[in-house]
Design a protein with these regions (language model features):
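ASCE RecA-like P-loop NTPase motor cores
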Residues: 1-222
Length: 222
């Protein structure tokens, strides 16, 4: 059986509860293909969160829905999760974070999750938005304060930045591999002024391209 909810805006609730409504429905007795077709048809005018019993069922439905629409997101959580196992599945965590920040950008989407994912405590949109770091070239920032903020939003310091969720520093340079990005970025400072923002290859450490601004999304769900 699948359970799904339709959208209605609410304040001071988690991002999922702001995204959906109390109008809830359950469907059963359909093939996986028909479930995907039915959910996609209901999505035309409403945002939907679909809750399955297990992660396996959620993944199957997500893959089916992707063949009908690009407006589908996945929020996976281990079915038998304990507090000691929170860091066991970094790939699932990255997928969850990408889904949360996609919802910040665009409300009208389908979200597929399993029961444990739906029960996961999540912050409000306001809390998530307040943790995003926005940087622009030729603007002034206190480098030490910026490093502290990067650490506070879930990034791990390493000697070399090559994996999503890591950052490193040397002199007036901060390297960071933000979630939602295919490559890490290099922040080069001249004093307190952000002199350049560049994508670089995580393997060769060579510059790929420059950009004028960047948003660094938190690497944490809380």
């Amino acid at each position: 059986m699948y359970h799904f909810c339709r959208k209605e805006r609410r304040k001071n609730m988690s991002i999922f509860n702001q995204f959906i409504t109390t109008k809830e429905s359950s469907i059963s007795g359909l093939t996986d293909e028909l479930k995907a077709i039915y959910i996609q048809s209901r999505y035309q005018d409403n945002s939907i969160v679909v809750v399955t019993n297990t992660l396996y069922e959620a993944n199957i439905l997500f893959q089916r829905l992707k063949s009908y629409t690009n407006e589908v997101l996945f929020f996976p959580m281990d079915d038998f999760l304990t507090s000691e196992a929170l860091a066991v599945s970094p790939e699932l965590k990255t997928t969850r974070l990408e889904t949360l920040y996609s919802l910040l950008k665009k409300n009208h989407q389908i979200v597929v999750t399993n029961l444990m994912g739906y029960l996961r405590y999540l912050p409000t949109k306001k809390v998530l938005n307040n943790k995003i770091i926005s940087l622009k070239v030729n603007h002034d920032y206190n480098m030490n304060e910026l490093i502290q903020k990067i650490y506070s939003i879930g990034y791990t310091k390493e000697t070399i930045t090559s994996v999503t969720g890591n950052y490193s520093t040397r002199g007036f340079v901060i390297d960071i591999f933000p979630i939602m990005e295919e490559h890490p970025i290099r922040l080069e400072f001249w004093g307190d002024t952000l002199d350049s923002i560049k994508y670089f290859d995580e393997n060769t450490q060579k510059t790929i391209s420059s950009l004028s601004e960047i948003k660094i999304f938190p690497n944490t769900e809380t």
